[in-house]
């Protein structure tokens, strides 16, 4: 992302200044001001399914702090809409929590993100179910976080989330030898959470997202 206060945005401003001077403009200035900057370099999630196929998901980011030293291993759990009730009886300490939210019609991402932080999760991964996610199943969203930078969050597409949820359903089938309910792809997030919340997936995450307070 080339956001305000980032190295890329500063370099772009310098380039425009040089180009304007080069074409002969004379009243050209570079003015500085202070703001909270954000450097988002990457957020790559890797997952190997039960058949041995490796999936690589490119995620989007929000204005929060989260950095790994290359790929680091995590457990990933799915908790519906990420409400307080969805966490009942589930230990998410140090885990990645994936939720499906509708920021347009329900609530902003800051609420499930802070809930995940209070529960000790490593980060929240938001999937836009309807609302801002209606443009395409492969779309990544990144709005203003409207929350603290120490409660990290990422964005995952509906298409990629479906692969992870399918693997969680396969775990239910393997454990309970019952595929009828677990294969229902028309479940609401609440119904899916009730089925899938007891299981987790092993994933790897390589991410670098850094908020830079009061930069110029």
Positions of predicted regions on the chain:
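Soluble metallo-hydrolase cores and metallopeptidase-like ectodomains found primarily
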Residues: 56-89, 143-216
């Amino acid at each position: 992302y080339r956001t305000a206060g980032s190295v890329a945005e500063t370099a772009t401003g310098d380039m425009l200044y040089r180009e304007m001077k080069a074409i002969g403009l004379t009243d050209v200035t570079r003015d500085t001001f202070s703001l909270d900057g954000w450097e988002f370099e990457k957020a790559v999630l890797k997952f190997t399914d039960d058949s041995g196929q490796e999936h690589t998901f490119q995620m989007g980011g929000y204005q929060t702090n989260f950095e790994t030293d290359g790929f680091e291993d995590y457990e990933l759990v799915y908790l519906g809409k990420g409400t307080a009730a969805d966490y009942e009886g589930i230990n998410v300490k140090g885990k990645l929590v994936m939720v499906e939210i509708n920021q347009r019609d329900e609530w902003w991402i800051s609420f499930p993100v802070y809930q995940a932080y209070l529960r000790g999760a490593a980060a929240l991964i938001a999937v836009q179910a309807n609302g801002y996610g209606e443009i395409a199943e492969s779309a990544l969203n990144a709005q203003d976080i409207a929350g603290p930078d120490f409660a990290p969050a990422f964005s995952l597409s509906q298409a990629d989330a479906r692969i992870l949820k399918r693997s969680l359903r396969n775990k239910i089938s393997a454990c309970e030898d019952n595929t009828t309910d677990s294969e229902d792809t028309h479940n609401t997030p609440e119904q899916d959470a009730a089925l899938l919340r007891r299981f987790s997936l092993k994933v790897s995450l390589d991410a670098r997202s850094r908020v830079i307070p009061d930069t110029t």
